[in-house]
């Protein structure tokens, strides 16, 4: 039932709602729906599939990783958003960088990012991953993981709550909805 409602939202020939642009549309049911056809753009279909099956690669480096585990636990249950944690970068399309990134770990982060298939997205979780955090002036700390990999969503906090990470994932889903895969 949920898939049909989602596909109804993606259709390019929706039900008339009495607005000005619906004047030329027939007042009855949608004729394409009556025949069993659903029309949509390829971009909308791909983005719908991508938002419903985001598989993050966890890159937990410090205390933010504990909150990331809380987000995957039963209270918030990221599975209901289609988010399933994967153990391999080759199986994931989202990387969650959680915690302090040091200079010695930066090449490993880049290598894991490069192993992910396209399209790929990065969520930076916590003050340390966003800009160095408490250890910003330490000689061995990278002042933000965006110096190593491109970041799509920043989740602030020290450590951010599990709810903040869920909100960041929902923001990433909105960002994916706005992307265009097929060039016009």
Curated annotation (Swiss-Prot):
The gene is nuoB. SUPFAM superfamilies: HydA/Nqo6-like (SSF56770). Coiled coil: none annotated. It comes from Xanthomonas oryzae pv. oryzae (strain KACC10331 / KXO85). This is NADH-quinone oxidoreductase subunit B. The keyword Transferase does not apply. Belongs to the complex I 20 kDa subunit family. It is found in: Cell inner membrane. NDH-1 is composed of 14 different subunits. Subunits NuoB, C, D, E, F, and G constitute the peripheral sector of the complex. Keywords: 4Fe-4S, Cell inner membrane, Cell membrane, Iron, Iron-sulfur, Membrane, Metal-binding, NAD, Quinone, Translocase, Transport, Ubiquinone. [4Fe-4S] cluster binds at residues 63-64, 128, 158. It catalyses: a quinone + NADH + 5 H(+)(in) = a quinol + NAD(+) + 4 H(+)(out). GO terms for molecular function: 4 iron, 4 sulfur cluster binding; iron ion binding; NADH dehydrogenase (ubiquinone) activity; NADH:ubiquinone reductase (non-electrogenic) activity; quinone binding. It is a peripheral membrane protein.
């Amino acid at each position: 039932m949920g898939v049909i409602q989602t596909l109804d939202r993606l259709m390019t020939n929706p039900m008339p709602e009495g607005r000005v642009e619906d004047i030329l549309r027939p007042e009855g049911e949608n004729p394409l729906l009556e025949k069993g056809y659903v029309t949509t753009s390829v971009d909308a279909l791909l983005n719908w599939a991508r938002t419903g099956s985001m598989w993050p690669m966890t890159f937990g480096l410090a205390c933010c990783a504990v909150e990331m585990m809380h987000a995957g636990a039963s209270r918030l249950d990221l599975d209901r958003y289609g988010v399933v944690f994967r153990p391999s970068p080759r199986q994931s399309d989202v990387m969650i960088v959680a915690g302090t990134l040091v200079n010695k770990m930066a090449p490993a982060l880049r290598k894991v990012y490069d192993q992910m298939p396209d399209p790929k997205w990065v969520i930076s979780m916590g003050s340390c991953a966003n800009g160095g955090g408490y250890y910003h002036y330490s000689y061995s700390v990278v002042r933000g993981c965006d110096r190593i990999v491109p970041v799509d969503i920043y989740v602030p906090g020290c450590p951010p709550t599990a709810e903040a990470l869920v909100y960041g994932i929902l923001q990433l889903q909105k960002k994916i909805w706005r992307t265009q895969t097929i060039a016009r």
